[in-house]
Amino acid sequence: EKYNLGLLGIIPSIGEVKTHKLLNFLKLVDEKKMQGGVRRRLITRENPKSPVSESYRSLRTNMLYSSSEKEVRSILVSSAGPGEGKTTTVANLAITYANLGKRTLLVDTDLRRPVVHKVFDLEREPGVTNYLSGQTSDYQSLVKKCEIDNLSIITSGIIPPNPSELLGSKRMMNLVKQLENDW
């Protein structure tokens, strides 16, 4: 109320996910990848009928219809500190958009503690920092496919010594504009 912002959704805590038959059935994650809580981040893929998955779909729908004038082309998820659910939120939101048949691109701009590549079992490099630091001028060479239809990912790339400067650069603004036009 203080900032006159509307509420688009509330995502409950995922908690522990049962691993026995569900993961074997989906064949999404093998035993090695389940360590470290990575498996539970993709709740919309692992357990699409759960209340948490429904909350992500509700959030997606509310975001789709929150602007009647113009289609939302990009979404930024941030928080004040680590471990607050940014990666889990963006991964599940991206899956819900892709499940609608929308061509979806998830860009990991957590340049300090990137995890998106682990969640989707992808190589971290090359990624967005390779583009921002001028190592490549073709962002399309960074786009990686994953197991989920309609979902592509640009991983973070190398961990730079100057993440704030890279994210605030003109090259980053140009990348966002290009991505909004192309995706």
Tell me what each language-model feature is.
Residues 1-103, 109-115, 122-125, 160-173, ...:
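Short boundary/hinge segments that flank catalytic cores
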Residues 1, 145, 177-183:
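Short, intrinsically disordered, charge-balanced linker/junction segments flanking boundaries
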Residues 126, 132-159:
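Nucleotide-state-sensitive switch-loop elements of NTP-binding domains
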